[in-house]
């Protein structure tokens, strides 16, 4: 990292609200860059040094780091923080004219994902594992990388490129309400849903960033009306959905550091789901700042 502002990549959804508050109210000095296609794009940008820090989905980071370690390559980044403690509800969506009516109809179907290695990709394997559809000889689905959320919606409708896709519930709900999509199920992540990754865990600016994010989280909790105004005013969420989401989400009290046990648990589930093998490098190959080491 240079002496310049931190370059922070984030996903432009409601979960980004404390980051915006950290900048607006507490003077976090950062150049922030939105990545609407998700965590797979964040990991690619960490690797090519176009960002210093990324706030993204736990499964996307752990899957990518595990695959990097399996190739015996040095990871370009590691995990340095925990952003959201609560699990993520992934809604399972099909096109509005689809004959699919339940999760059980999805075996061997075409799954649309934002990109290989993204959360939407990884969670399709977690779904397959929970349903007992995993076979060593073949993939449980035909995986179709489509890009951003709009491309996924188009892909199950007019584009007819995929049979279903998975995306965060509240981001998707508007399209159930307007009839564009049909909801056939849901799956929760079996781990805290959002983490923070960085290229250089020794950079002192990360400590300042964590302090400012903690303040942003506290502001978010204490000023829920402003939080709803930000979410509905800058993103495509209704007031009703924003308020409903506020009741379900739990941001970390202190974002600095990662619970090694959480990463171990995530690795074990991703191994069981066929996303990672036993050469994934374990926690040491993924975590740069653990909660036990972060200090006070």
Residue ranges of predicted features:
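Predominant activation on well-ordered alpha-helical scaffold segments within soluble catalytic domains
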Residues: 20, 61-62, 93, 125, ...
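Secondary-structure end/capping motifs
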Residues: 203-277
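Conserved C-terminal helix/tail region of periplasmic/extracytoplasmic solute-binding proteins
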Residues: 271-296
């Amino acid at each position: 990292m240079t002496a310049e502002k931190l370059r922070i990549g984030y996903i432009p959804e409601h979960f980004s609200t404390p980051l915006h508050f950290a900048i607006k109210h507490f003077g976090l000095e950062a150049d922030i860059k939105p990545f609407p296609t998700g965590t797979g794009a964040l990991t690619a940008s960490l690797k090519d040094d176009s960002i210093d820090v990324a706030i993204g989905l736990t499964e996307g980071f752990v899957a990518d780091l595990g695959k990097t370690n399996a190739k015996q390559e040095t990871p370009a980044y590691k995990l340095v923080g925990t952003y959201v403690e609560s699990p993520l509800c992934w809604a399972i969506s099909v096109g509005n004219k689809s004959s699919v009516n339940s999760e059980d109809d999805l075996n061997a179907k075409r799954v649309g994902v934002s990109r290989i290695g993204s959360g939407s990709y990884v969670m399709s394997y977690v779904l397959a594992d929970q349903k007992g559809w995993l076979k060593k000889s073949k993939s449980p689905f035909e995986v179709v990388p489509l890009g951003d959320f709009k491309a996924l919606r188009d892909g199950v409708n007019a584009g007819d490129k995929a049979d279903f896709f998975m995306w965060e519930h509240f981001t998707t709900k508007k399209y159930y309400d307007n009839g564009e999509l049909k909801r056939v199920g849901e799956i929760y992540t079996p781990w805290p849903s959002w983490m923070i990754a960085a290229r250089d865990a020794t950079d002192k600016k990360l400590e300042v960033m964590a302090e400012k994010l903690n303040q942003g989280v506290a502001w978010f909790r204490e000023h829920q009306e402003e939080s709803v105004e930000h979410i509905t005013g800058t993103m495509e969420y209704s007031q009703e959905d924003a308020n409903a989401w506020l009741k379900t989400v739990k941001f970390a009290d202190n974002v600095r550091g990662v619970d090694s046990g959480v990463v171990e648990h995530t690795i074990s589930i991703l191994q069981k789901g066929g996303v990672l093998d036993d050469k994934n490098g374990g926690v040491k190959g993924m975590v740069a700042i653990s909660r036990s080491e972060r200090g006070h």
